A protein has these predicted regions:
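A structural signal for short, well-ordered beta-strand segments and their strand-loop junctions
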Residues: 52-55, 64-66, 124-129
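Short amphipathic alpha-helix that is part of the acyltransferase structural core
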Residues: 1-37
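Glycine-rich phosphate/pyrophosphate-binding loop shared by adenosine-nucleotide-utilizing enzymes
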Residues: 59-65, 92
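Hydrophobic, Leu/Ile/Phe/Ala-enriched alpha-helical segments that form helix-helix packing faces
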Residues: 21, 25, 41-45, 112-120
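Acyl-donor binding region in acyl/amide transferases
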Residues: 74-144
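A short helix-loop-beta-strand connector motif used in the catalytic cores of GNAT acetyltransferases and
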Residues: 39-57, 68-74
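Mixed-charge, low-complexity intrinsically disordered regions
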Residues: 2-3, 7, 143-150
Length: 150
């Protein structure tokens, strides 16, 4: 079977993103997932256009961000159960974020707001590890101001 060039490029891109995510995984984001599961989640976000990748001038990846459109009462099960995005949902679950430094983090945040401006009017949900356990966090727009202005 011969694959079109764009498919080969897409697979190479996804593999590059997966490698970056694995390299920067701290055990709190993908929590024991194997490489194939991470590849599947990256490809899923690429296909549904909820994947941002920040590069430097030489095309080295410096940051990756993936999110879900959901409702305020959705939690980690929404992700684990592979539920489809709720396009009319009232919230955005900021699920997977890897960044090499403050500048990359800022650029990802700006790109996210540009690509998904509705984030400024929707609930923002995330998980953070506190005392060794994941805890649901509800963020405000102050988070974005703090990131961009620091």
């Amino acid at each position: 079977m011969v694959f079109p060039f764009w498919q080969i490029e897409a697979i190479a891109f996804i593999n590059k993103v997966v490698d970056f995510c694995i390299e920067h995984e701290n055990g709190k984001v993908f929590d024991g997932w194997d490489e194939e599961m991470i590849r599947l989640i990256v490809a899923y976000h690429w296909a549904k256009q909820t994947l941002l990748v920040h590069h430097n001038a030489d095309e080295t990846i410096k940051g990756v961000f993936m999110w879900y459109n959901c409702n305020k009462d959705d939690g980690w099960n929404f992700i684990n159960n592979w539920e489809p995005d709720r396009e009319d949902g009232d919230s955005i679950f900021m699920a997977f974020l890897f960044s090499e430094g403050k500048d990359s983090f800022k650029e990802l945040t700006k790109d996210f707001i540009n690509k998904c401006p509705e984030v400024l009017t929707k609930n923002k949900i995330g998980l953070r590890y506190r005392s060794g356990f994941p805890k649901r966090i509800n963020y405000s727009n102050k988070l974005f101001k703090k990131i961009i202005n620091n």
